[in-house]
Amino acid sequence: MSADVWSQGCERLATELPEQQFNTWIRPLPAAELVDRGDTAVATLRVPNRFKLDWIRNQYAARIESVLSDLAGKPVRLDLQLAAREAPPRPSSDAPRSNGHPQAAGQWLGAPSSSNAGAYTQASAPTPTHRLNTALTFDTLVPGRANQMARTAALHVAGAPGVMYNPLFIYGGVGLGKTHLIHAVGNALLRDKPDARILYLHAEQFITDVVKNYQRKTFDELKAKYHSLDLLLIDDVQFFAGKERTQEEFFNAFEALLAKRAHIIMTSDTYPKGLADIDERLTSRFDAGLTVAIEPPELEMRVAILMKKSDVEGTPMPEDVAFFVAKNVRANVRELEGALRKVLAYARFSQKDINIALAREALKDLLSIQNRQVGVENIQKTVADFYKIKVADMYSKKRPASIARPRQIAMYLAKELTQKSLPEIGELFGGRDHTTVLHAVRKIGGERGKNTELNQQLHVLEQTLKG
């Protein structure tokens, strides 16, 4: 088979795919090795890292095979392989090594080599050490609807930093996996490019650095540290609120990094326009790239998390027990992991098999608090107060949008936060049919992923109800 088939295939893909997608994922690839096998052919394509390989397999492999088959006049199978890479330079004997445990915030990752000076800016910065939490990777992150968009965007950045979605702003409640996701990007890039300059830190560490350098009048050191990065990962930028000097220095670093096409990923508990006491210059830039939310995990995702985490702990959890725990622990991944540890510890100490009865006993305090706090009546009152309508409107037949909308939101929350069935919820909303409740649940649930304002309102209501 002619080697020209691959170049012709790329030319066709360039016309069929959006330009940015083609330039990000297809153009940088080396030419495929084409082997004729009689009635069929194999195109071996070597991809530089696991993340690009998985993404190309899931998003483009079928399209590539179709184009190559058409050009070759016979079926072509795409064989994706990881490209061999030279081992990175050995660290000096006195360089700290990663121990795999969570590390203190604000640590350097990777050092630029002289051979890569064109790609990475050198600066008089501290000697880097590999201090990311190596356990927080894409492989250990359980995917689901709640984190689908954020995970997809993070994979894009890991595969092609500085190209698209810059900055990437990830927001959501406590314990939903934002930190895990940005560590995963850092670990992915570090594995692909060991000489990249990467820095993960919490916003409070940046504030501390600004204060320290302000006191010492050493702002050149601050610039050398932050302006020379290839990837900045910063958690909880809402902590910058009201700190004008910190915001000024972060703005300068932000502009310097974007100018050199370094990538910035931030997390927050709210979307950019919802950040209080932060300069509009910053929030407008936060919003200029891609803003994505991580939602509380849905039931199936919670079950998957429990099953995966329990396997890692070496004590697999039966599926029926995982469903029981997942139905009763809804807030976030952190609480879910806490519940799992309680169940596993209880089983270990009591030397009993893990079953629903044991899980109920292990979590009795948690279940008691939840049952006492979240009821349909409490939801109705909380939602009515939030939207400034009467509680009686929840049961009435009134249909103006100012009443119908909060009523649908209350039905949605009743389904999400209680164990009530659809008919039971309908009965508590003035004897409505279960199909009415189902419509409300689907409508609000569907809009939540698209409507930032609605999502924020629901987040506030959920946090209020859960105490």
UniProtKB/Swiss-Prot annotation:
Residues 85-127 are annotated as: Disordered. SMART domains: AAA, Bac_DnaA_C. Residues 131-347 are annotated as: Domain III, AAA+ region. The keyword NADP does not apply. Its main location: cytoplasm. It is found in: Cytoplasm. Residues 74-130 are annotated as: Domain II. Keywords: ATP-binding, Cytoplasm, DNA replication, DNA-binding, Lipid-binding, Nucleotide-binding. GO terms for biological process: DNA replication initiation; regulation of DNA replication. ATP binds at G175, G177, K178, T179. Pfam families: Bac_DnaA, Bac_DnaA_C, DnaA_N. Belongs to the DnaA family. Domain I is involved in oligomerization and binding regulators, domain II is flexibile and of varying length in different bacteria, domain III forms the AAA+ region, while domain IV binds dsDNA. HAMAP family: DnaA_bact. Plays an essential role in the initiation and regulation of chromosomal replication. ATP-DnaA binds to the origin of replication (oriC) to initiate formation of the DNA replication initiation complex once per cell cycle. Binds the DnaA box (a 9 base pair repeat at the origin) and separates the double-stranded (ds)DNA. Forms a right-handed helical filament on oriC DNA; dsDNA binds to the exterior of the filament while single-stranded (ss)DNA is stabiized in the filament's interior. This is Chromosomal replication initiator protein DnaA. It comes from Methylibium petroleiphilum (strain ATCC BAA-1232 / LMG 22953 / PM1).
